[in-house]
Structure formats: C-alpha cells, structure tokens
C-alpha cells in the first residue's frame, strides 16, 4: 500500500451536509447573490441596488397592517362557467394555482389598522395566475369595499396583475365596470379609495380600479401600463422614451401622486388616511 492510500484511509469520513435550495436568491436587477432570509427581512428589497422584488399577499399584509388584523373570507363564485380549455383545462389551472398559494384566488382582503388607522386592505397575489382579474377577484373587490363602508374606513387596493383573466372571457371584463361601481359607492359613503401600484400592474386592472384612486401611490420601479411596450412601439412606429411605463416616469408626467419606498409605505398610508379621514372623524 502506498503512502497516498495510507493518508486517504486515515482521513475521517464527514457526511455531506444538506444545504437548502432556497438559501440564496439572485437579485433580478443587479444580479448580486443575497441570503434569502436577509432579503426577506429587508422587505424583499435588494440592499445593493434597492430593487423592489415581488412579494406575496401574506407578506404584504404583514408589512402594512398592525398585529391582529382580520382576514376576510373570499366570496364564492361559479368556477369555469365557460368550460374553457387551452393547452389544459381552466379548472386544472385553478387547482394548480391553489396548490401553490395560501389563498383561493388572486385578491385577498383584510380588515385592520395601519399604524392605528382603520382600513380594509385588498392585496393582489401576482403568483396566482399572474394576479389576473376574474369573477373571484371582482367579487372580492366588491366585498372589500362593502366592508369598508360598513366599518366607515378607507379601502386600500394593492395592485399586482397582468390584466383580465382570459379563461373567463367577457365575464372577466365585466369586473372592470363592477369595480368602478363599487368605488363610486365608496365615494357616495364619503370614504376614500387609495391605490398602491406595485410591479407589475397592467392590462384591464390598470384600465379600471388601479387608476381610480383618490390617492395614487407606487413603489419604485413598478411597471404600470395597459398594453406592452412592444405592442405600443409596433403600433405607433416610434421608439418609446427611457423608463416609459415605470413608476418614476408616470409620477414625472402627473399620472400618479407619489413614489414611495416599501419601508416607508406603511407610515405614508397612515398619514394619508389620517389626513383624508380627519374631517369625517370630527363630523
């Protein structure tokens, strides 16, 4: 036996440690590798480039609402009324989305307080079929505004959507006027409607309730628009300006009221609600 074998045999056996697959995350903007826990503790904002990552409904509610908030039940709807099928059945897509998400559809409502200010908050879950707006989202939106009217508080919509849910056809598009009527009822009750635009907010959602807020707030770098940039460029046959459809561009051109960093969002919302509700509280 050679001395090499003697050394190799003398080395102690150390079993390979299992490393979690999700220990690291790569920033989609600057490509820096980040510890997932540190990234999540930083509200899913990159500490190197300040890129605001997409977060789920539960994380968003935990970030915005004080402890002890109430999750509102999701209204029931008839599933797959058109018996739609593309490469797979719509009912199968719904089942797969529900298996991967904690909520039954793409909009979740909660009632609670934002730094002591009462509010009903509706958060869209982009991970649920791209946050697409269908009958379930429409019903949840209406239910959220109705609860806000009952509680005499604002309704805050946190949008993140690719648009209308094509598998529901005209029934999906009907949610655009439905949500508009719900906002009108909120206003008739003398209550504010506040929108927080997050990345991405596009399509039929942008063309309806996402742009109807009394106060329009956006997160930095959020993509906000109706049609995609390629579609617009091919239609008008012109190159679009730098940063087109981003939150900062919309703010510079008067389309939204403010761009607010995620860490400041809760305090900003509390201040806005306090200002808008001051006269009503005194009345």
From Swiss-Prot:
The keyword Ubl conjugation does not apply. Its main location: cytoplasm. It comes from the Bacteria. Residues 23-283 form the CoA carboxyltransferase N-terminal domain. GO terms for cellular component: acetate CoA-transferase complex. Belongs to the AccD/PCCB family. This is Acetyl-coenzyme A carboxylase carboxyl transferase subunit beta. Zn(2+) binds at residues 27, 30, 46, 49. Binds 1 zinc ion per subunit. The lineage of its organism: Bacteria, Pseudomonadati, Pseudomonadota, Alphaproteobacteria, Sphingomonadales. It is an enzyme of class 2 (transferase). It is found in: Cytoplasm.
């Amino acid at each position: 036996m050679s001395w090499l074998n003697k050394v190799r045999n003398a080395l102690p056996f150390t079993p390979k440690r299992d490393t979690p697959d999700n220990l690291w995350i790569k920033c989609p903007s600057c490509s820096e590798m980040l510890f997932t826990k540190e990234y999540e503790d930083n509200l899913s904002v990159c500490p190197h480039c300040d890129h605001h990552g997409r977060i789920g409904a539960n994380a968003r509610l935990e970030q915005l609402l004080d402890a002890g908030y109430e999750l509102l039940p999701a209204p029931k709807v008839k599933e797959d009324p058109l018996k739609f099928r593309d490469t797979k059945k719509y009912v199968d897509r719904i089942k797969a989305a529900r298996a991967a998400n904690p909520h039954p559809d793409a909009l979740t409502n909660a009632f609670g307080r934002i730094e002591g200010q009462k509010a009903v908050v509706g958060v869209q879950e982009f991970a649920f079929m791209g946050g697409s707006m269908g009958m379930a989202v429409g019903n949840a939106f209406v239910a959220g505004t109705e609860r806000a009217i009952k509680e005499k508080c604002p309704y805050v919509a946190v949008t993140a959507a690719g648009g209308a849910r094509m598998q529901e056809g005209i029934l999906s598009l009907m949610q655009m006027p439905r949500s508009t009527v719900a906002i009108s009822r909120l206003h008739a009750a003398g209550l504010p409607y506040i929108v927080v635009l997050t990345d991405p907010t596009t399509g039929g959602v942008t063309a309806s309730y996402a742009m109807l807020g009394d106060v329009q707030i956006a997160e930095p770098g959020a993509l906000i628009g109706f049609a995609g940039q390629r579609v617009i460029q091919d239609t008008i046959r012109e190159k679009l300006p730098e940063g087109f459809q981003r939150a900062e561009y919309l703010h510079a051109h008067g389309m939204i009221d403010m761009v607010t960093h995620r860490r400041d969002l809760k305090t900003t919302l509390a201040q806005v609600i306090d200002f808008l509700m001051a006269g009503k509280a005194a009345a």
